[in-house]
Amino acid sequence: MMSAASTNPEFPIATSGTKDIVLAFSGGLDTSFCIPYLQERGYAVHTVFADTGGVDAEEREFIEKRAAELGAASHVTVDGGPAIWEGFVKPFVWAGEGYQGQYPLLVSDRYLIVDAALKRAEELGTRIIAHGCTGMGNDQVRFDLAVKALGDYQIVAPIREIQKEHTQTRAYEQKYLEARGFGVRAKQQAYTINENLLGLTMSGGEIDRWEAPGEGARGWCAPRSAWPSEALTVTLKFVEGEAVELDGKPLPGAKILAKLNTLFAQYGVGRGVYTGDTVIGLKGRIVFEAPGLISLLTAHRALEDAVLTKQQNRFKPDVARKWVELVYEGFYHDPLKSDIEAFLKSSQAKVNGEVTLETRGGRVDAVAVRSPHLLNTKGATYAQSADWGVEEAEGFIKLFGMSSTLYAQVNR
């Protein structure tokens, strides 16, 4: 354990009296460790749990009781569902791109957690914020950059601090808590788990060892043996690129996504093993599950394909990839992100209509699209009939390929 006399400016020690500190708390191993660790260094720890849609009522109650059990001076739970829909899901779906073409940015609720923590700090009159991020991952970058962008705060990162002296930090945290009479849930011992409205990620254990994930590394998505035998079909309605109805029923966006999570998780949709480049240059490997978000992206992309022009569909992914990179790398409050979102919002003006999704397990397909803005021609059907003549088609082909034809003629 680190000495209370540490002078590391990143981890200030309250040596006289008690200072209020706000801890972004999830009830997991890392943030559970943070409470007694900070208390023993002279802090009154006020915990904030931002409920961004990954827990049920029973789990919320557990988190509240866990904070009290560990000795938190106060605890508040903040409803982050509407904020995560407006602040992340809408622009992410408009962008339609995963990080490095795969990962759907499932821990982007970190920025909303920061907002909740800073609001609580303002209520308490303190400028000291703590989080349970490690010194090797991306979350520390997202938390710290978001806090720095929003004001002059002191950031305390206990897990990052103990990693200077302990290589097996999770084992150390567990022993630390058990030595003080606090139990640790079994799954917390093996994996780092993040859950929210967007989906679920797991790391640790065999995942970090580049081995096949065991059955314990499974959260929402049912295994193949448990998939229903009947196909699932749902219809989503979009207005200006935003999902507003599910199967004909108007619902708030966050509730639509929550229902899609439940429906498509039964069929194992949206589960993957992802290896990518982290912000700090390491390779990161996780299991992720995002049944609702993947289904929503599939429907939205099908509608865009049908109503946007060829040039829009060609150009938008380039801009979208930059937006995804900014969010992934911690630049959530950079003005370029807002600039890109203005373009993405503009591109959605005609993205209106209904899309029917279908799954029989493992993947989801958009099987029907209806929109008043479909870019089809009454007199033309792809590869079958058209309202232009053969001569017009031949002339178009000649002009369209003129540059390549001339090059070939000159260089034969």
UniProtKB/Swiss-Prot annotation:
EC number per UniProt: 6.3.4.5
Entry keyword annotation includes Amino-acid biosynthesis: yes
Recorded GO CC terms: cytoplasm
List of residues binding ATP: A24, F25, S26, G27, G28, L29, D30, T31, S32, A50, G132
Binding site for L-aspartate: T134, N138, D139
GO MF term list: argininosuccinate synthase activity; ATP binding
Catalytic activity, as annotated: L-citrulline + L-aspartate + ATP = 2-(N(omega)-L-arginino)succinate + AMP + diphosphate + H(+)
Associated pathway: Amino-acid biosynthesis; L-arginine biosynthesis; L-arginine from L-ornithine and carbamoyl phosphate: step 2/3
BP GO annotations: argininosuccinate metabolic process; L-arginine biosynthetic process; urea cycle
Record keywords: Amino-acid biosynthesis, Arginine biosynthesis, ATP-binding, Cytoplasm, Ligase, Nucleotide-binding
Chain positions recorded as L-citrulline binding sites: Y103, S108, N138, R142
EC class name: ligase
NCBIfam families from the UniProt entry: argG, PRK04527.1
Family statement drawn from the similarity comment of this UniProt entry: Belongs to the argininosuccinate synthase family. Type 1 subfamily.
Keyword Nucleotide-binding set for record: yes
Record-given protein name: Argininosuccinate synthase
InterPro entries assigned: Arginosuc_syn_C, Arginosuc_syn_N, Arginosuc_synth, Arginosuc_synth_CS, Arginosuc_synth_type_1_subfam, AS_cat/multimer_dom_body, Rossmann-like_a/b/a_fold
Name of the gene: argG
Subcellular location: Cytoplasm
Major localization listed first in the record, in broad terms: cytoplasm
